[in-house]
Structures are given as structure tokens and as C-alpha cells.
Amino acid sequence: MASTRSIELEHFEERDKRPRPGSRRGAPSSSGGSSISGPKGNGLIPSPAHSAHCSFYRTRTLQALSSEKKAKKARFYRNGDRYFKGLVFAISNDRFRSFDALLIELTRSLSDNVNLPQGVRTIYTIDGSRKVTSLDELLEGESYVCASNEPFRKVDYTKNVNPNWSVNIKGGTTRTLAVASAKSEVKESKDFIKPKLVTVIRSGVKPRKAVRILLNKKTAHSFEQVLTDITEAIKLDSGVVKRLCTLDGKQVTCLQDFFGDDDVFIACGPEKYRYAQDDFVLDHSECRVLKSSYSRASAAKYSGSRSPGFSRRSKSPASVNGTPSSQLSTPKSTKSSSSSPTSPGSFRGLKQISAQGRSSSNVNGGPELDRCLSPEGVNGNRCSESFPLLEKYRIGKVIGDGNFAVVKECVDRYTGKEFALKIIDKAKCCGKEHLIENEVSILRRVKHPNIIMLVEEMETATDLFLVMELVKGGDLFDAITSSTKYTERDGSAMVYNLANALRYLHSLSIVHRDIKPENLLVCEYPDGTKSLKLGDFGLATVVEGPLYTVCGTPTYVAPEIIAETGYGLKVDVWAAGVITYILLCGFPPFRSENNLQEDLFDQILAGKLEFPAPYWDNITDSAKELISQMLQVNVEARCTAGEILSHPWVSDDASQENNMQAEVTGKLKQHFNNALPKQNSTTTGVSVIMNTALDKEGQIFCSKLCQDSSRPSREQTSPVPPSAQEAPPPLESPRPPGPPATSGCDLAGTWRRHRD
């Protein structure tokens, strides 16, 4: 009984025992009778607290006592950690006798080697406006930020969490804003989200953890939320997941990237991502584990749309078609070996597996990725040295596949500018490496606005990687046939661009030897202007003396090449003269009526130049004069590229403005109708890049009698059967004007003239 009294002393006080006036028991009444005064005298029942058996009474109500003993729930975040969802604590006077005790418990729960290594020493309000210094300042349902000695870092801590335990918080808080923003995100189109199983491998030293993730509309609400959940599941040593990369090295930047063709991702922390060789190695047993995972993942994709999705905050392991799978928001389930197979993942092994079930038309090029950009290399050999290239460029699908090279989409990660990645298989160049070496050495030297530029190169033991400028405007013929207006002045500007490129090359003693319309690409600039760019340097070489190799395309080959008397830089001027002639009338100056190459060569050697009516009636004499100077059989009398630029028809705008688009286009289609049409304007630029020096072997022949070997380069670059390659080549240019690349494009006044 004494112990009971001591416990209740804090809630009761001693009653004042002073007697009330006239309340003495048994006192005689004024009437002389014995009567009971006080409450009984008034007919009231005395309270037990005021009875003689209890000398104490309550000073606070039971409701107030219950409220004081009830624990207050509050959520605590780490200072500056935007990926941490917060930790809920129940705070009561029984559990924490002092504020320091709370700090000790928060340190034990929130501090580690990465986060708050000095422990929790300060608690801020969620907006950082003030510090909390006592337990009484902590309010029910509120959120707070824990820090060491550093100042408060302003972060939207409530962005990735919507506490459902807060029952007393009214509207107008930061949490309300977070919910409102979340609702606005839901309104955005999420049609690309389909049930999909992906594998996430954490970066770092081996053995590396790999977890399988199910993504659907219930588990993938936003990119930030998925990153947060991956952080919980993968548990990086360096802290939060800062970046996710595909096996190609492409960084995942939005939610939609998870639902592309990539199934495996590498989780990276704050450290700089390394494309080390060890990161790309898997042994056979690990490959088998991942291969089985992919087979199960494909089954999950098929049935995922019919099965109910997992809850984003599920607390129990989930399974797909009977196969245990780790859930992003369930860290406990990720620890089991069945739900998160732990294996030292590598890019090579994973890519081999993932490519087996993909078509070659996927965004990464399907099996072509294994051949060209995976560490396996083109021939299955390791070429992990190529991956620093991926740090700067994002590699896309295959856009061109030739006999010796593959061309892929290539985008600069920092500027967003598009390029073309040319990948040459060294195994196919065995014994002829000097040809490729010569071509690349020339590309390294040339830098001119009218020449397709080599941006960057990289070489491995098995492959040669060339980042090339990508020109999408079609070729020279496309510029004419796709326009609504084509004048003599436009032709003059085209010749200026070509002569400008030739003057630069010849100043370096470089001869191109394959000047033709399909190697002249139209570059379109943002301001609407255009210029020509010369490409395909497979036959180019440095002139150190007379050359005797008979090569080129028959329509544009110079007479000294056919005669085998030795030639030099001016063979390019002859080819430019043929192109100028075609630009103004639509047909070549030398042609065979019987379609015989020997007749064509005889006409070229004779050099008899005519300007037949009525096709040349409206062409200025200045243009005819320039063409005559360019098509001189006598090399000494032939003009140079510099003289072309200084000619009045080119430099002084002596050309006319009459529209001759219909006439020239009609003749082009009549005389250049024997090559395959391209699908779009980009195809032409890719074909030029795809050509290599090895593709030019068909354009090298010993004499004019060896007619079967001068197959045009355009047809050589496509995979044609050997029997087809031996067919006699056509006499006209191998590139006809295909379908218009664009419609309604007016060329008048839009051609650039780059001045050196």
C-alpha cells in the first residue's frame, strides 16, 4: 500500500485538512438537536477523494495523463541525402529520458562510414529554419533533418516519400507540395512502361552483387524513385546510386531508358565510373546464371501484363512465374540468394546473353553490338580498350554494314551532336593493312569545311574505330532533283565548293582520284544554307612523283590515267570538269552509244568536247570556257583548282538565274539510271563513310582492256555476290539521282562559299 501511494504522489497532492466552518461532526445544532452538517446535511454524497479514507486528490485529468505518456512519431532524414526516405522514430519520455539519449539512438540508426560519420549532433526542422534542442520541441507527425556539425543543406527531403502515419498535420506543409507534384507527374504519359525484368549489377571490386528488378507501372513511378529503390536494393559501398549505365556505357537519364532494349545495368556511386577491363569479365558459371535469369525474364515479360503488379512498398519477397525475384523497395528480399543472385557481373558475358534474343534492328544493333562494340570485339577477341570512347559518345544502332566496315549512330554526350562511328574489322584486312593505314593517315591530315572530317580515332588489337562527321543532306544529284528551282548560279556555287576542297588537298600534295557526284555530300546548316563536302578517301594518296595505277570511275577518269603515262594532281580537275558539265546539262561529256567501256575510253583519250544544242543554248559562254579549260587532254594546259576558284564564272557570279531544274533532272534520270536508289538522304552519307580502301580494289585495273575489274565503288560497298561483281560495269556514273531526299527545297541563294 505504501508503494502504491509513492507512485501516485506525482499525480496527487495532500488535501487541506483544515475544518470547514460548521462542519464539525456531532456538534449540536442550534435547535438543540443532534444533526449532521456538511454535505450530508445538504443531501449530497461525498466524493471518495474527499472522504476520510483518502487524503489526496487528482490535479490532472486522465486524458491529459494519457496524452503525456503517448509516444510522438517523427521522421528523421540525413542532411543532404536526397535518396534517403527517412526513418520513423516513436519518441516518448519512457524511451528517451533526455535529448542526448535521442541523439545517441539516431547516431546508431543513421550514421555509418559514408553518412554522418561523426554521428548525429544537431537536429534541424525540415525547412532548416531552426535547430531542435529538446524533446518537447519535437511534434507529432513532423519531419526533421539530422546533421553532424555541418550547416543545413536545403533538399526536398519529402520528394520520395508520402508518410501515411501522420494524422495531425494540416494542409500547407511541404509534404502537401510533394504530393501535388507527384500527382502532376502521374498525369504524364507512361505508355512506354511495360512489365519488365532487369538486372542491376553494382560497380566495384568483385564479387559484385547483382539484383533482378521488376519494373511496371506500380513500381516505376519516376526516375528518381527508381534510383532510390535501386540504392536500397544494391547497397553500394560508396553510398547512393548516382548513375546507371547500360552495357554499352550509355548513361540512363530518364525513366524511359529502363524500358528500351537493354536488360542489364551497372549501378555507379559518386565515384568516377571506370571502364576497366575487369568490369567486363564473367566466367562460364556466372554466364549460365545470368542466361537462366534472362530466360525467366522473357517469360515474365510475357505474363507480366496479365498478373497483378507488385506494390511499390511491398514488404515481402515477390516471384514471377515461380521464380523468386527481388523487389526494388524490399531490401530484405534482396539479401536472399534466390531473389538476388550474387555474381561478379561483366559486360562481355552479359552482352553475349542479351544479344541472343534480340534482332539486329534494335537500338544497340543487336548481335552487331557484340561484333563491333562489346569487349568481345569484331572477332570475339577482347578489345576492352575501346570503351574510353564510350565515355564521350553514346553509340546507337547500326546504320550501315559494308564488306569491311560497320557504321553506327554516334552522339556526343556533352553537345548532342550526331556523328557516325566507323568500325573496321582488322581480321578482314589481313595482308592489306597498308591500304587502311594510308586512308586513315590522310584523313588525319585534312581539316577543311568542304571535306568530311575525321573527328576522333581509336585502335585496338582487333578493330579500328573512326568517329566521322555525318552529313545527312544527300549527294550532289539529290540537291538538284529534290529542289524546286535549280539555276546556273547554284551550279557555280557547287563547283566553287568542290574546287575549294581540291585546292586544299592539292596544297598538301594529296590526290583524291575518285571525284564523282556520289562522293559529294550536301551539308545543311541551321541557318538554311548549304555546302558540299567531299568524302571517301579510299583511293586518295600523297603524290611524290608520277602515279601509274589505273583506277577510278570510268565516266570521270582522266585520259592520262587510261594512257598509263603517269599522272598527278590534275586528274581531280578533269573529274571536276566532267561534274561541272553534268551539272549544267544533265549528261556526261563523254559517253558510249553502245554502252561499251572501250568506246568510252577512246572518247576520253580523244578529248573531243562538244556543247550540243538545244541543251547548251541557254548556258553562258563563261561556263563553257571554264569547262573547256578543265577538260584539256594536255595536262599542262589544264587549269588548276586555284584557277577554277579565280574564274569569273565561279568568283564573279557570271552565271545566270534561269531555272533549269526540269531539263537537268530529266537528263540525269535518263543517263544515270543504273544504280540502286537509296532509301533516304542519310543513306548516301553513310555509304560514303562505310567505304574503305579495300572496297576500291574493284576500281583498280591494269589497262583499258581489263574492263571487268572497274566495278564502281557504290556497288562494291554493298554485299554483292562475287559473280555479280564480275559483271561488266556501266559506262555512265554508277550513281543515278534517286528519289528526292526532300521536297520543295529551293536552292536559290542558299549555297555557302567558304573562303580560305
From Swiss-Prot:
It catalyses: L-seryl-[protein] + ATP = O-phospho-L-seryl-[protein] + ADP + H(+); L-threonyl-[protein] + ATP = O-phospho-L-threonyl-[protein] + ADP + H(+). It holds the Pfam family DCX. It is an enzyme of class 2 (transferase). ATP binds at residues 399-407, 422. The active site is at 514 (proton acceptor). Binds to and stabilizes microtubules. Interacts with MAPK8IP1/JIP-1, MAPK8IP2/JIP-2, MAPK9/JNK2, PPP1R9B/NEURABIN-2 and actin. This is Serine/threonine-protein kinase DCLK2. It comes from Mus musculus (Mouse). The gene is Dclk2.
